[in-house]
Amino acid sequence: MRLVFMGTPDFSVPVLEALVAAGHEIACVYSQPPRPAGRGKKDRPSPVQARAEALGLPVRHPVSLRSDEALADFAGLQAEVAVVVAYGLILPQAILDAPTRGCLNIHASLLPRWRGAAPIHRAIMAGDAQTGVCIMQMEAGLDTGPVLAREAVDIGPEETTAQLHDRLSALGAALIVDTLARLDQLEAVPQPEDGVTYAAKIDKAEAQVDWDQPAEDVDRLIRGLSPFPGAWTLLGDTRVKLLGSRIAEASGVPGTVRLNPLRVVCGTGAVELTQVQRAGKAVQSAADFLNGSAIEDGTLFKGKS
């Protein structure tokens, strides 16, 4: 099938690779423009652009798709389907209408739950037992289109956003290949009006831990914001990111550190920290963090006040 692929971050790369491996003709890859990155602030191509170029595929990275030139360029590709996954630009109606069989979006949630920008983070932060991937026929609304295929997965009790991200990326890659192979047999099912929730973009202000909250909420925050932006607390004046956790038991006032293993008391219950990162340092296991720190039992982490 003649496709246009539209994606930008790491999440999208396995999908592009799967479409190529399945023998689809990729007429063009669209991705966000290169951004300044690294210490030298040199322009760096997106993960999708870098992989597409390595595969020998043509790449376009327009700043907008609304100009007459951009619309004509897209229509000229004469694609049957556009596959869209975490592209980052809103597609105008003329783009949605250009492929003869429409635009298909890979969305990392079980729609209509968690429409929007951060469905993986929000599913973990909300304590959802399950999430998954949907293949949706795109329309003008935000993740409102009818669903062609869906597959659910359980969220592990210690799973982080990074881990779930990789699982859902692989699942989405397999599901879109299967969907395209069976496109003539699949029925697009409208999303129900009940159960709609929105996965708002993560605000860094959410990331500071409030140790007065129940351990379940703190654990979900830590896992849901790992690795980015990373839940954090203060040890003295030093910011410490908390990147892995599990539910534990300990007593004391909220924020109290207990050792062997590294645990922190919450409003109710406690969390055990499994991965941490001091400001300017590499990610460490809790054991390595304790070996390199002068933390004593009873030390207080300062949380959100």
From Swiss-Prot:
A molecular-function term among this protein's GO annotations: methionyl-tRNA formyltransferase activity
Catalytic activity from the UniProt record: L-methionyl-tRNA(fMet) + (6R)-10-formyltetrahydrofolate = N-formyl-L-methionyl-tRNA(fMet) + (6S)-5,6,7,8-tetrahydrofolate + H(+)
Name the residues that bind (6S)-5,6,7,8-tetrahydrofolate.
109-112
SUPFAM superfamilies, per this entry?
Answer: FMT C-terminal domain-like, Formyltransferase
Q: Which UniProt keywords apply?
A: Protein biosynthesis, Transferase
UniProt KW Acyltransferase keyword? no
Q: Which Gene3D superfamilies match?
A: 3.40.50.12230
Superkingdom is Bacteria
Q: Name one Pfam family in it.
A: Formyl_trans_C
Q: Which GO terms of the cellular component aspect does the record hold? A: cytosol
The record's annotation in PROSITE patterns points to:
GART
The EC number on file is 2.1.2.9
UniProt cross-references to NCBIfam families, sorted A to Z: fmt
Q: What family is reported? A: Belongs to the Fmt family.
What is the stated purpose of this protein? Answer: Attaches a formyl group to the free amino group of methionyl-tRNA(fMet). The formyl group appears to play a dual role in the initiator identity of N-formylmethionyl-tRNA by promoting its recognition by IF2 and preventing the misappropriation of this tRNA by the elongation apparatus.
- Which PANTHER family does this one have? METHIONYL-TRNA FORMYLTRANSFERASE, METHIONYL-TRNA FORMYLTRANSFERASE, MITOCHONDRIAL
What name goes with this protein?
Methionyl-tRNA formyltransferase
User: Organism, per UniProt?
Assistant: Roseobacter denitrificans (strain ATCC 33942 / OCh 114)
The top of its lineage is: Bacteria, Pseudomonadati, Pseudomonadota, Alphaproteobacteria, Rhodobacterales
This protein's gene is called fmt
